[in-house]
């Protein structure tokens, strides 16, 4: 999995106008349906970022073993909006269809993607396996939500820590987006436990209906600019 991020704080009329001329018709329609400008900007950024991520990942997969796709931290690609516009390549606007559960997927390709946004940040995960990603900002009074939807063990781990709440919430959202089942159907049956591994490292494990899930890889990226929490998941290859 590779994760890409962009920040719409740098959005301006020039980038907006150029970007709208680049993105495919379905994305333009989606942008136009939004009422507020910030939502339009996030949607445009998502379209630009998806094209960029798909392009780089496609090239990477074509030359696997010959080139490396790495960042300074090897965790996330932070890409400026103007770079997304300059690098846009319509040949990577692959046809998107919707699976039976409503999850958008590329038609007939072994490239999977997922998008999320919060505040001024937009993120995109791409992989050769199904993926799910979520980004959130820690929020106050989160414990009330936790008490309603989370397990007792999760609530005990969170306490009154808004960052810990965001970590659990993004994990649940990422799983819901990985499966395409939606948060309402997964929030209560999936539990995340922060445990200690055999070598005494702190790890997060997922339990579905009380059974540990060993077929999913979890990524936690905490925190971007001390404001955001990102969690992502993909299935582990057999």
Residue ranges and their predicted role:
Residues 1-238:
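Core catalytic alpha/beta fold that binds nucleotide/phospho-ligands
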